[in-house]
Amino acid sequence: RSCCPCYWGGCPWGQNCYPEGCSGPKV
């Protein structure tokens, strides 16, 4: 699965890879 944009909390087609937002690390 792809990552959602960092400024989104989540999206139907991907996972939230930026739980701390755009300023946080990608997980």
Curated annotation (Swiss-Prot):
GO cellular component: extracellular region; nematocyst
Effect of residue 25 to A: Low increase in binding affinity to cockroach neuronal membranes and in toxicity to blowfly larvae
Record flagged with keyword Disulfide bond: yes
Effect of residue 2 to A: No change in binding affinity to cockroach neuronal membranes and in toxicity to blowfly larvae
Annotated phenotype, changing residue 5 to A: Low decrease in binding affinity to cockroach neuronal membranes and in toxicity to blowfly larvae
Effect of residue 26 to A: No change in binding affinity to cockroach neuronal membranes and in toxicity to blowfly larvae
Record flagged with keyword Nucleotide-binding: no
Species per Swiss-Prot/TrEMBL record: Anemonia sulcata (Mediterranean snakelocks sea anemone)
Protein family membership: Belongs to the sea anemone short toxin (type III) family.
Effect of mutating residue 23 to A: Low increase in binding affinity to cockroach neuronal membranes and in toxicity to blowfly larvae
Protein name from the UniProt record: Delta-actitoxin-Avd2a
Effect on the protein upon substituting residue 13 to A: Loss of binding affinity to cockroach neuronal membranes and of toxicity to blowfly larvae
Keywords on record: Disulfide bond, Ion channel impairing toxin, Nematocyst, Neurotoxin, Secreted, Toxin, Voltage-gated sodium channel impairing toxin
Note: Negative results: is inactive on mammals, when tested by subcutaneous injection into mice at a high dose (up to 5940 nmol/kg of mouse). Does not inhibit rNav1.2/SCN2A, rNav1.4/SCN4A, hNav1.5/SCN5A and rNav1.6/SCN8A.
Disulfide bond residue pairs: 3-17, 4-11, 6-22
Cited function: Specific arthropod (crab and insect) toxin that inhibits inactivation of voltage-gated sodium channels. It competes well with the site-3 toxin LqhalphaIT (from the scorpion L.quinquestriatus (AC P17728)) on binding to cockroach neuronal membranes (Ki=21.4 nM), and inhibits the inactivation of D.melanogaster channel (DmNav1), but not that of mammalian Navs expressed in Xenopus oocytes. Its activity is synergically enhanced by ligands of receptor site-4 (Bj-xtrIT (AC P56637)).
Signal sequence annotation: none
A single MF term (Gene Ontology): sodium channel inhibitor activity
